[in-house]
Amino acid sequence: MALTSSVKEELSRLDIKKSSVRKAEVSAMLRFAGGLHIISGRIVIEAEVDLASTARRLRAAIAEVYGHQSEIIVVSGGGLRRGNRYVVRVVRDGEALARQTGLLDARGRPVRGLPSAVVNGSAADAEAVWRGAFLAHGSLTEPGRSSAMEVTCPGPESALALVGAARRLGIQAKAREVRGVDRVVIRDGDTIAALLTRMGAHDALMVWEERRMRKEVRATANRLANFDDANLRRSAQAAVAAGARVDRALEILGDDVPDHLKYAGELRVAHKQASLDELGRLADPPMTKDAIAGRIRRLLAMADKRALDLGIPGTEANVTPEMLDE
């Protein structure tokens, strides 16, 4: 599954209880995926998304949070557009929902950005804004030189609101116009990882981080065509750095770390030079390479999320310059 789809599928399954957070997400989804139409003299809301799971999430939230009914219309792909699209349409209560979600102001005029209640909301509301915007019109490219998280925006006002929401989370995003289309873009790998964590896409983050590490290893291998003793020492330093991250993860989580993740982490720390295959064979009972790698990735992601919530340094804090020294 493509990275963008895997992030959206995971976010669509995320269980959110707090009403204000769900409202912020719905407002963002309708703003970034939707539009207002006048049909037979009444206001109709339509929001077009690319995944059925996203459409179902939006429809459920509209019913559960606002008490309005909607329908999902499947638009078959054709021409340059691949795959089906899904339109969530609110007809009967379109105007009421538009006012409730900030698409219309108190005088019935269209709002170009996001409603002030959302813009000035909590950090959880800011996370919900990004979650809704990404579900509506976001994309995530493969890690590498041109990696980016991007959201296409309906206008400059909504783009600036999204940049502001990121800023409230301590994340730097840039608004730019490309060929007449407003976009908000994040290119820094660590920043992308932090935002995936804040949105709640922890499984997708682990996949993205794994691919990112592979790219970095491959790039390093390409640069070092002829290995000498110094290069071999650097490889050993990288392994030590990985063990240091796990050390920090165990320290952050303390007694809260699940036993199976703790066991995988302790194996990594105890055998810093071992490959994942070797770690799997050292486990009791033995595990596959993918199983041990998955547990270590989940341990690091869980620790970094906890560190982010507590406002303390994450797992990278244990990686010293000497470990990365070339």
UniProtKB/Swiss-Prot annotation:
Function: Involved in cell division and chromosome segregation.
Stated family: Belongs to the WhiA family.
Designated gene of the protein: whiA
Gene Ontology molecular function: any one: DNA binding
Keywords, sorted A to Z: Cell cycle, Cell division, DNA-binding
Protein name: Probable cell division protein WhiA
UniProt-listed PANTHER family: CELL DIVISION PROTEIN WHIA-RELATED
InterPro entries the record matches: Homing_endonucl (IPR027434), Sporu_reg_WhiA_N_dom (IPR018478), Sporulation_regulator_WhiA (IPR003802), Sporulation_regulator_WhiA_C (IPR023054), WhiA_LAGLIDADG_dom (IPR039518)
GO biological process: cell division; regulation of sporulation
Keyword Cell cycle: yes
Organism: Arthrobacter sp. (strain FB24)
HAMAP family, A to Z: HTH_type_WhiA (MF_01420)
Entry keyword annotation includes DNA-binding: yes
